[in-house]
Curated annotation (Swiss-Prot):
One of its GO terms (biological process) is maturation of LSU-rRNA from tricistronic rRNA transcript (SSU-rRNA, 5.8S rRNA, LSU-rRNA). This is Ribosome biogenesis protein RLP7. It comes from Kluyveromyces lactis (strain ATCC 8585 / CBS 2359 / DSM 70799 / NBRC 1267 / NRRL Y-1140 / WM37) (Yeast). Its main location: nucleus. InterPro entries: Ribo_uL30_ferredoxin-like_sf, Ribosomal_uL30, Ribosomal_uL30_CS, Ribosomal_uL30_euk_arc, Ribosomal_uL30_ferredoxin-like. Residues 1-49, 101-121 are annotated as: Disordered. The keyword Nucleotidyltransferase does not apply. GO terms for cellular component: cytosolic large ribosomal subunit; nucleolus. PROSITE patterns: RIBOSOMAL_L30 (PS00634). Involved in the biogenesis of the 60S ribosomal subunit. May act as a specificity factor that binds precursor rRNAs and tethers the enzymes that carry out the early 5' to 3' exonucleolytic reactions that generate the mature rRNAs. It is found in: Nucleus, Nucleolus. GO terms for molecular function: RNA binding; structural constituent of ribosome.
Length: 318
C-alpha cells in the first residue's frame, strides 16, 4: 500500500523553498545562456574578415550567379521554342555508380561516356542518357555547396520550394519535365538518385516526422510518425490508412504522392562523417576526394543532372 503524503508544515515549507530555489537557479542559467549567445553573436558580427576571404567569396558567388543565369536563359529559349542558337535542346542525366569488383567497362557506349582523364580506373561507371520526360521517383539530399559561395536568391528560393533549407535533409520528389530545370538550378547543393523500395521503407519507418496537434496542445508540434490512427485521420479520405500505404504511394508514384510527401516533414539524416579526431579527419579527406569524382560541378547551361547510387548513401546516413 502507498504511504500517505506527509502534510507536516515544515516539510511542505522545505519543499516549497527547494522548488523556489531550483526555479531561480534555472532562470539564472537561462539568463546566462542568453547573454552568452548574444555575446557570441556580437563577436561574430565584429569578427575581422581577411581581404582574400572577401575576394574568394565574391568571385565564387559571381561564378554561381553566372551559371544560374545561363541555365535560366537556356530554359527561357526552350519555352519560347527559339532553338536556333542553343547548344542542345535535350536534357541529359549522368548516372554515376560504383563498379563491381572484377568488372571492367569494355562496351563501346561506356567507353564513349568516360572521359580521357577518367579512363584511369577510379572504380566508377559513368552513363550519360537523354531524359525523355517520363516521371520517375527521386530522393534528393541537401548537401554543402561549393566552397565560399553565398547561395543566390533564385537557388535559395528553389531549395525552399523543395523544403531543403537545412543541410543533411532529404525529400522524395517526382522528376518531370517541369522539375528538371529546378534541379539544374540547385545541382551544386543537392545529391539525387533513384531509391529502392527497401530504402524508402527504411527511411519512412526510421526517420518519418510530421506536424501534429494534440487536443491539449495550443499549436502543432513535431512528432515521430509511428501511429496508423494519425495516418488514417489525416489521409483516410484519400484511401491511405497506414504507414505501409504511404510507402506504396511514394514507391509507385500514386495519385496521392504529393499529399503523402507533404504530409511528411523532410527527413533529417545523420552526417556522413562526424568528430574531430584523427580518424574522422582522414575519413573527411576520403569523402572530399570521393565527392570530387561524383559531384562534378559545371558552369555550362547544358550540363547534365548527376544521379548517384542513392541507396548506398541512404544506408550511410540513415
Amino acid at each position: 500500500m502507498s504511504q500517505p503524503l506527509n502534510s507536516n508544515p515544515e516539510v511542505l515549507l522545505r519543499k516549497r523553498r527547494n522548488a523556489d530555489r531550483t526555479r531561480l537557479e534555472k532562470q539564472e542559467l537561462a539568463k546566462k545562456r542568453k547573454e552568452q549567445e548574444e555575446k557570441q553573436k556580437r563577436s561574430k558580427k565584429n569578427r575581422f574578415v581577411r581581404a582574400e576571404t572577401i575576394v574568394a567569396t565574391t568571385l565564387a558567388t559571381e561564378r554561381e550567379k553566372t551559371r544560374i543565369r545561363r541555365v535560366r536563359d537556356l530554359e527561357n529559349q526552350k519555352v519560347k521554342n527559339d532553338l536556333s542558337h542553343i547548344p542542345s535542346d535535350r536534357d541529359f542525366i549522368l548516372r554515376i555508380s560504383e563498379r563491381e569488383a572484377g568488372s571492367k567497362a569494355t562496351s563501346e557506349s561506356e567507353l564513349q561516356d568516360v572521359d580521357e582523364e577518367d579512363e584511369e580506373d577510379d572504380g566508377l561507371i559513368r552513363e550519360k542518357i537523354v531524359y525523355d520526360g517520363e516521371p520517375s521517383l527521386l530522393f534528393v539530399i541537401r548537401v554543402k555547396g561549393p566552397t565560399a559561395v553565398k547561395i543566390p536568391a533564385k537557388a535559395y528560393k528553389v531549395l525552399s520550394l523543395l523544403r531543403l533549407v537545412e543541410l543533411n535533409t532529404g525529400v522524395f520528389i517526382k522528376l518531370t519535365k517541369d522539375v528538371y530545370p529546378l534541379l539544374k538550378l540547385v545541382s551544386p547543393y543537392i545529391v539525387i538518385g533513384q531509391p529502392s523500395l527497401a530504402s524508402i521503407r527504411s527511411l519512412i519507418q526510421k526517420r518519418s516526422r510530421i506536424m501534429w496537434q494534440r487536443p491539449e496542445d495550443k499549436e502543432p508540434k513535431e512528432i515521430i510518425l509511428n501511429d496508423n490512427n494519425i495516418v488514417e485521420e489525416k489521409l483516410g479520405d484519400e484511401g491511405v490508412i497506414c504507414i505501409e500505404d504511404i510507402i506504396h504511394e511514394i514507391s509507385t508514384l500514386g495519385e496521392n504522392f504529393s499529399k503523402c510527401t507533404f504530409f511528411l516533414l523532410p527527413f533529417k539524416l545523420n552526417r556522413e562523417v562526424s568528430g574531430f579526431g584523427a580518424i574522422s579527419r582522414l575519413n573527411k579527406l576520403k569523402m572530399r576526394e570521393q565527392n570530387k569524382k561524383t559531384r562534378q560541378i559545371s558552369n555550362a547551361a547544358t550540363a547534365p543532372v548527376i544521379q548517384v547510387d542513392i541507396d548506398s548513401m541512404i544506408s550511410k546516413l540513415n
